[in-house]
Protein backbone atom coordinates (compact mmCIF):
# COMPACT_ATOMS: atom_id res chain seq x y z
CA UNK A 1 0.00 0.00 0.00
CA UNK A 2 1.03 3.60 -0.35
CA UNK A 3 0.74 6.80 1.68
CA UNK A 4 -2.22 8.94 0.57
CA UNK A 5 -0.23 12.16 0.65
CA UNK A 6 3.27 11.19 -0.49
CA UNK A 7 2.66 8.04 -2.51
CA UNK A 8 5.45 6.40 -0.48
CA UNK A 9 5.43 2.61 -0.63
CA UNK A 10 5.13 1.52 2.99
CA UNK A 11 6.25 -2.05 2.26
CA UNK A 12 9.70 -0.71 1.31
CA UNK A 13 10.39 0.32 4.91
CA UNK A 14 13.70 2.15 5.11
CA UNK A 15 15.24 0.27 2.17
CA UNK A 16 17.35 2.67 0.08
CA UNK A 17 16.41 1.48 -3.40
CA UNK A 18 18.32 4.28 -5.16
CA UNK A 19 21.60 3.30 -3.48
CA UNK A 20 20.99 -0.35 -4.27
CA UNK A 21 20.41 0.35 -7.99
CA UNK A 22 23.28 2.87 -8.11
CA UNK A 23 25.66 0.33 -6.61
CA UNK A 24 24.49 -2.50 -8.88
CA UNK A 25 24.53 -0.44 -12.08
CA UNK A 26 27.26 2.13 -11.51
CA UNK A 27 24.88 4.77 -12.88
CA UNK A 28 23.43 7.85 -11.21
CA UNK A 29 19.94 7.10 -9.90
CA UNK A 30 17.03 9.31 -8.90
CA UNK A 31 13.79 7.81 -7.67
CA UNK A 32 10.64 9.89 -7.68
CA UNK A 33 6.98 9.60 -8.42
CA UNK A 34 5.80 9.42 -12.01
CA UNK A 35 4.54 13.00 -12.20
CA UNK A 36 7.75 14.48 -10.78
CA UNK A 37 9.90 12.37 -13.09
CA UNK A 38 7.78 13.39 -16.09
CA UNK A 39 8.08 17.02 -14.98
CA UNK A 40 11.87 16.69 -14.78
CA UNK A 41 11.92 15.27 -18.31
CA UNK A 42 9.78 18.16 -19.59
CA UNK A 43 12.02 20.64 -17.77
CA UNK A 44 15.14 19.06 -19.25
CA UNK A 45 14.11 18.47 -22.88
CA UNK A 46 10.40 19.14 -23.26
CA UNK A 47 7.70 21.77 -23.13
CA UNK A 48 8.90 23.15 -19.77
CA UNK A 49 12.46 23.73 -20.99
CA UNK A 50 13.31 27.36 -20.23
CA UNK A 51 10.06 27.90 -18.30
CA UNK A 52 10.56 29.59 -14.92
CA UNK A 53 7.21 28.66 -13.35
CA UNK A 54 5.15 25.77 -14.63
CA UNK A 55 3.44 22.53 -13.83
CA UNK A 56 2.67 19.14 -15.29
CA UNK A 57 -0.61 17.48 -14.34
CA UNK A 58 -0.92 13.78 -15.14
CA UNK A 59 -4.33 12.23 -15.67
CA UNK A 60 -4.54 8.50 -15.05
CA UNK A 61 -5.62 6.20 -12.24
CA UNK A 62 -5.32 9.27 -10.05
CA UNK A 63 -4.08 12.81 -10.70
CA UNK A 64 -0.40 13.58 -10.36
CA UNK A 65 1.44 16.84 -10.41
CA UNK A 66 4.90 18.24 -10.72
CA UNK A 67 5.60 21.88 -9.93
CA UNK A 68 8.45 24.02 -11.29
CA UNK A 69 9.21 27.30 -9.53
CA UNK A 70 12.14 29.52 -10.46
CA UNK A 71 13.25 26.88 -12.96
CA UNK A 72 13.51 24.05 -10.42
CA UNK A 73 11.31 21.06 -9.61
CA UNK A 74 9.86 21.64 -6.16
CA UNK A 75 9.63 18.83 -3.62
CA UNK A 76 8.82 20.58 -0.35
CA UNK A 77 9.87 19.82 3.19
CA UNK A 78 7.70 16.68 3.32
CA UNK A 79 8.08 15.78 -0.38
CA UNK A 80 4.41 16.58 -0.98
CA UNK A 81 4.70 19.45 -3.46
CA UNK A 82 2.56 18.67 -6.49
CA UNK A 83 0.41 16.06 -4.74
CA UNK A 84 -2.73 17.52 -6.30
CA UNK A 85 -4.53 14.20 -5.86
CA UNK A 86 -4.70 14.91 -2.10
CA UNK A 87 -6.47 18.26 -2.58
CA UNK A 88 -9.97 18.31 -1.10
CA UNK A 89 -12.87 18.94 -3.49
CA UNK A 90 -15.70 19.01 -0.95
CA UNK A 91 -15.04 21.21 2.06
CA UNK A 92 -18.20 20.01 3.79
CA UNK A 93 -17.04 16.39 3.62
CA UNK A 94 -13.22 16.28 3.52
CA UNK A 95 -12.55 12.54 3.17
CA UNK A 96 -10.29 10.50 0.87
CA UNK A 97 -13.37 9.97 -1.33
CA UNK A 98 -13.66 13.71 -1.92
CA UNK A 99 -10.09 14.37 -3.03
CA UNK A 100 -9.02 15.32 -6.55
CA UNK A 101 -7.47 11.87 -6.91
CA UNK A 102 -10.74 10.12 -6.15
CA UNK A 103 -13.06 12.44 -8.07
CA UNK A 104 -10.89 13.15 -11.12
CA UNK A 105 -9.56 9.72 -12.10
CA UNK A 106 -9.30 9.33 -15.88
CA UNK A 107 -9.44 5.56 -15.47
CA UNK A 108 -12.70 5.81 -13.52
CA UNK A 109 -14.15 8.18 -16.13
CA UNK A 110 -13.27 5.66 -18.87
CA UNK A 111 -14.86 2.84 -16.86
CA UNK A 112 -18.00 4.90 -16.13
CA UNK A 113 -18.47 5.80 -19.81
CA UNK A 114 -17.85 2.18 -20.84
CA UNK A 115 -20.51 0.93 -18.42
CA UNK A 116 -22.99 3.64 -19.47
CA UNK A 117 -22.43 2.83 -23.17
CA UNK A 118 -22.39 -0.94 -22.60
CA UNK A 119 -18.83 -1.32 -23.90
CA UNK A 120 -17.73 -4.83 -22.96
CA UNK A 121 -14.11 -3.94 -22.11
CA UNK A 122 -14.39 -1.23 -19.45
CA UNK A 123 -10.72 -0.31 -19.99
CA UNK A 124 -11.01 0.29 -23.75
CA UNK A 125 -10.22 3.98 -23.95
CA UNK A 126 -10.35 3.96 -27.76
CA UNK A 127 -13.94 2.68 -27.77
CA UNK A 128 -14.88 5.16 -25.04
CA UNK A 129 -13.45 8.12 -26.96
CA UNK A 130 -15.28 6.98 -30.10
CA UNK A 131 -18.52 7.36 -28.12
CA UNK A 132 -17.42 10.69 -26.68
CA UNK A 133 -16.37 12.03 -30.09
CA UNK A 134 -19.71 10.90 -31.56
CA UNK A 135 -21.44 13.00 -28.88
CA UNK A 136 -23.15 9.94 -27.39
CA UNK A 137 -25.81 11.09 -24.89
CA UNK A 138 -24.68 8.48 -22.36
CA UNK A 139 -20.96 9.27 -22.64
CA UNK A 140 -20.96 13.03 -22.93
CA UNK A 141 -22.29 14.02 -19.45
CA UNK A 142 -19.72 11.80 -17.71
CA UNK A 143 -16.89 13.09 -19.89
CA UNK A 144 -17.99 16.71 -19.58
CA UNK A 145 -18.14 16.47 -15.77
CA UNK A 146 -14.63 14.97 -15.72
CA UNK A 147 -13.30 17.80 -17.92
CA UNK A 148 -14.98 20.36 -15.69
CA UNK A 149 -13.17 18.95 -12.64
CA UNK A 150 -9.84 19.04 -14.50
CA UNK A 151 -10.52 22.63 -15.60
CA UNK A 152 -11.35 23.67 -12.03
CA UNK A 153 -8.10 22.11 -10.81
CA UNK A 154 -6.16 24.07 -13.44
CA UNK A 155 -7.99 27.31 -12.58
CA UNK A 156 -7.20 26.85 -8.88
CA UNK A 157 -3.52 26.11 -9.57
CA UNK A 158 -3.25 29.18 -11.76
CA UNK A 159 -5.02 31.37 -9.19
CA UNK A 160 -2.56 30.37 -6.47
CA UNK A 161 0.68 30.03 -8.43
CA UNK A 162 0.36 32.32 -11.50
CA UNK A 163 2.22 29.83 -13.70
CA UNK A 164 3.77 30.53 -17.10
CA UNK A 165 2.74 27.15 -18.52
CA UNK A 166 0.75 24.09 -17.45
CA UNK A 167 1.05 20.77 -19.28
CA UNK A 168 -1.38 17.87 -19.23
CA UNK A 169 0.01 14.34 -19.37
CA UNK A 170 -1.28 10.82 -19.13
CA UNK A 171 -2.77 8.50 -21.70
CA UNK A 172 -5.86 10.56 -22.44
CA UNK A 173 -4.03 13.88 -22.75
CA UNK A 174 -3.53 13.32 -26.49
CA UNK A 175 -7.28 13.20 -27.12
CA UNK A 176 -8.32 16.42 -28.94
CA UNK A 177 -11.81 16.29 -27.39
CA UNK A 178 -10.27 16.41 -23.89
CA UNK A 179 -8.37 19.63 -24.55
CA UNK A 180 -11.31 21.15 -26.43
CA UNK A 181 -13.74 20.47 -23.57
CA UNK A 182 -11.33 21.67 -20.86
CA UNK A 183 -10.68 24.83 -22.89
CA UNK A 184 -14.42 25.36 -23.31
Region locations from a protein language model:
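ATP-binding/phosphotransfer module of carbohydrate and carboxylate kinases, centering on a glycine-rich
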Residues: 2, 19-27, 41-51, 88-184
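Phosphate-binding/catalytic loop of phosphoryl-transfer enzymes
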Residues: 2-98
Amino acid sequence: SSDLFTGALSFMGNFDLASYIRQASGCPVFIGNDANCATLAELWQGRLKGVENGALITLGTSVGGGLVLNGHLMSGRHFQTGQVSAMVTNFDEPTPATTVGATTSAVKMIEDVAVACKIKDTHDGWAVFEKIDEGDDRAWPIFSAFCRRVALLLINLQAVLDLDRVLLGGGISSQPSLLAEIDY
